[in-house]
Amino acid sequence: MSAFVTKAEEMIKSHPYFQLSASWCPDCVYANSIWNKLNVQDKVFVFDIGSLPRNEQEKWRIAFQKVVGSRNLPTIVVNGKFWGTESQLHRFEAKGTLEEELTKIGLLP
């Protein structure tokens, strides 16, 4: 097991709400805007790989693929399990159920 996989597992285990992200990724910017809009940005640990060298970004993405089954940016993990990407947030927002869904996972009271 690579050090990247071990560290990915540790980060996910340490943070009930986790997001693999990159500063250059428009979908990640959207997800972060949701956390800010709902004032839960302090609850979601965002691991931003955007400033790392390309080869290191790829190693992290491979590690998260192995750990949670997704290498997408953003990858949102709740209580150690893959929850979704920005697509999930868009779907819930379009249906008008975003806050309800985030309440179900304990992110909103």
Curated annotation (Swiss-Prot):
InterPro entries, A to Z: Glutaredoxin, Thioredoxin-like_sf
Induction comment: Strongly induced by the exposure to arsenic which causes glutathione depletion.
GO terms of molecular function: glutathione-disulfide reductase (NADPH) activity
Main location: cytoplasm
Name of the protein this chain belongs to: Glutaredoxin-8
SUPFAM superfamilies the record matches: Thioredoxin-like
Note: Present with 573 molecules/cell in log phase SD medium.
Boundaries of every Glutaredoxin domain copy: 5-109
